[in-house]
Design a protein with these regions (language model features):
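Juxtamembrane "helix-exit" motif on the non-cytosolic side of transmembrane helices
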Residues: 42-55, 82-83, 106-115, 136
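Membrane-interface loop-to-helix entry segments
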Residues: 205-220, 304-325, 353, 357
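Alpha-helical transmembrane segments
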Residues: 26-42, 95-106, 151-155
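Interfacial segments of alpha-helical transmembrane regions
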Residues: 144-153, 222-259, 263-272
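Membrane-interfacial alpha-helical segments at the cytosolic side of multi-pass membrane proteins
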Residues: 224-228, 314-331, 361-372
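Membrane-interfacial catalytic/cofactor-binding modules of polytopic membrane enzymes
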Residues: 254-327
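Intramembrane catalytic core of multi-pass membrane enzymes that act on lipidic substrates
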Residues: 125-213
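Interfacial helix-loop-helix junctions of multi-pass membrane proteins
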Residues: 262-263, 308, 340-365
């Protein structure tokens, strides 16, 4: 007698079709990056713009963020997976006090040679390297994030190139529309006014903390790439990068049709604002770079990004939250961190409030498009 047929059981053809759709979804970002790069090549050739990248700057900054990402991922891992990461490490140091002494001396050396933030990062990375060695983690396992990292690097270079190309051929500026929307949201006030008043009255420690929160986003993205790739698998890391790049695609398309720039670009008294010096210099550098682009100066494409609406600085952490949602403690910590980040984005005059709302929408679309076909994979131990 034949066994009963389960009407709800997936057939081989349906399984194969789902697998194909999943693969297409997973590599959608790669297809997008390749398509954008082809459009970039054709567009720059048509307009006689030399395609020249500052590769050394890209590599240097990517390496710095990569090191910071390792430190960030170790902190998140210790918080979100204490029994797997923190407890065994604590036991090892308790059983071998000499190890703690050596680590203390190494930390003292780092803090003597480098600024406090850099020293802390190097110390955390050193701890991570020692832990990987002690646990005997296979080299092949440690290479899981490599392909997603290369994928992200190529995608970001393409995005920066496309952004530079767009501001070269389009001089339109619809920021006044976004500013008007902001005036309704802020009851007649503006993002620049809010930023200047806050920075004039807040202690330097607060504005510095907000600045660190803003720039730390890049390490947060790298940490998510590392955690998803190492704990879930390389394919999950690739899916994360695809989602980020898809969000950038939406942003680039909006910017091509509706170019907007951050509030400091049109702020009359921006030079007098009491923003942190690093923030002022970064914003002034972008304004200078934009002027050169719009005057068709022959300068290499660097890590320059001009898009105000929608705000990718809020879209990306939301995507990170989605991919790290299975670790509740990490999620809780990042919700607090990203709430501070959202405040920093406006209070340091990087974006309009309306830009943040656009960023939330872009993140939602990118997540739905890139993850709705994929079954969630359970995390595993790192071996």
């Amino acid at each position: 007698m034949l066994p009963p047929v389960d009407a709800h059981a997936p057939t081989k053809s349906s399984t194969d079709a789902t697998s194909r759709v999943s693969r297409i979804s997973r590599y959608r970002g790669l297809t997008i990056a390749a398509g954008l790069f082809v459009v970039l090549l054709l567009g720059m050739r048509i307009h006689g713009i030399p395609l020249k990248f500052s590769v050394s700057n890209f590599l240097e900054r990517y390496a710095v963020v990569g090191i910071q990402s390792i430190a960030y991922s170790l902190i998140l891992g210790a918080i979100g997976m204490p029994t797997e990461i923190f407890v065994p490490m604590k036991e090892r140091y308790r059983e071998s006090p000499l190890r703690l002494v050596i680590l203390g001396l190494l930390g003292a050396l780092f803090f003597y040679l480098y600024p406090p933030f850099a020293a802390a990062v190097f110390l955390l990375v050193s701890i991570g390297i020692l832990e990987a060695y002690d646990r005997g983690i296979a080299a092949l396992t440690l290479t899981r994030p490599l392909l997603p990292a290369i994928y992200l690097f190529v995608g970001l270079i393409t995005v920066f190139g496309f952004n530079a190309y767009l501001v070269t051929i389009r001089t339109a500026n619809y920021s006044s529309i976004v500013a008007t929307l902001d005036s309704y949201l802020l009851f007649g006030h503006s993002a620049s006014e809010l930023s200047h008043r806050f920075c004039a009255s807040a202690p330097d420690t607060i504005t510095t903390a907000l600045m660190i929160s803003y720039f730390a986003l890049f390490a947060q993205i790298g940490a998510c790439l590392l955690i998803t790739s190492l704990k879930v698998g390389r394919e999950e890391g690739i899916k994360f990068v695809s989602t980020i790049l898809f969000a950038y695609l939406i942003t680039m398309l909006i910017f091509a049709a509706f170019p907007t720039f951050s509030p400091y670009f049109t702020c009359a008294d921006h030079q007098q604002a009491k923003l942190p010096q690093v923030v002022l210099e970064a914003q002034q550098g972008l304004m200078q770079q934009l002027r050169l682009r719009q005057h068709h100066a022959n300068i290499p494409i660097d890590t320059e990004y001009y898009v105000a609406f929608p705000c990718m600085h809020i879209a990306q952490p939301l995507i990170v939250l989605w991919f790290l949602r299975r670790w509740r403690r990490i999620l809780a910590v990042l919700i607090v961190v990203d709430t501070i980040l959202a405040a920093a984005i406006v209070l340091l005059e990087w974006h309009y409030v309306t830009d943040l709302l656009g960023g939330v929408a872009v993140a939602g679309i990118a997540i739905v498009v890139n993850t709705n076909f994929s079954r969630e994979t359970e995390p595993s131990s790192i071996h």
